[in-house]
A protein has these predicted regions:
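Intrinsically disordered, low-complexity cytosolic regulatory tails
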Residues: 65-86, 93, 137, 159, ...
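Activation segment
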Residues: 106-111
């Protein structure tokens, strides 16, 4: 970490915006719905100005017209999220720590799988931590850690320490981004916002309701190396 370049918050936020705009294009294009299935730090390419592009479409999947759902009503307008049609899969693809748990359990792929992965990516960017960490008791997911700190009103402890001393540190903006991440990683895909809704939240064009805290976690990380962190690529 000592020899790694610290990316200031403003640059990290620009990366976030670049990625979500990419997902809006992929998930909500008029030409069809592309689900990337492997949104994670190592699949985000940065140039010298920290502009970001989504890369590695090796396991991406195109949802057919019959399985897509398009609706003008947003999740917040009615209070009840609209249905999200799915494509059934027998083979689960992705990276442990970023795979939508509902996709793993039900084996039905929706574009909300990318939103879940994006939520974990947000937590990576805010915290500088791996998606899965080795601790004395075994493996701890970043998702579990974030929810634990949220429930204990200690969310400030999630923030990447070097960020605090960097120019442009904005605590309220970072915490707002974390709240958006919590909505993206809701266990039920129908509770997650769409990519365009996430973009509006990040742009402060849409309110962020209080996220629902899950009662428990079901993911099995026993076969994961947990080696994919936001800062490891710098």
């Amino acid at each position: 970490r000592e020899n790694q370049q610290i990316i200031v918050w403003h640059a990290r936020l620009n990366i976030i915006f670049d990625v979500i705009r990419g997902l809006v294009y992929l998930n909500e294009s008029a030409d069809g719905c592309v689900v990337h299935r492997d949104i994670k730090p190592r699949n985000i390419i940065l140039d010298e100005n920290f502009s970001a592009k989504i890369a590695d479409f090796g396991i991406s999947y195109i949802l057919t017209e019959a399985t897509q759902y398009t609706h003008e009503e947003t999740w917040t307008e009615s209070g009840v999220p609209p249905p999200d049609y799915a494509q059934e899969h027998t083979h689960i693809a992705g990276t442990m720590g970023y795979i939508d748990p509902e996709y793993m359990t039900l084996r039905k792929l929706t574009k909300k799988a990318d939103i879940y992965s994006f939520g974990i990516l947000l937590l990576n960017i805010v915290s500088g931590k791996k998606s899965i960490e080795q601790i004395d008791e075994g493996l701890l997911s970043l998702e579990e850690l974030a929810w634990k700190l949220q429930k204990e009103d200690r969310l400030n402890e999630l923030i990447d320490p070097p960020l605090v001393n960097c120019n442009g540190f904005n605590l309220s903006e970072i915490l707002r981004t974390t709240m958006i991440a919590f909505w993206c990683i809701q266990r039920e895909s129908k509770l997650r916002p769409s990519a365009s809704q996430v973009l509006r939240m990040l742009s402060s064009e849409e309110e962020i309701p209080t996220p629902q805290v899950p009662n428990k976690f079901h993911c099995d990380y026993s076969h994961s190396s947990g080696d994919d962190s936001w800062t490891s690529q710098f």
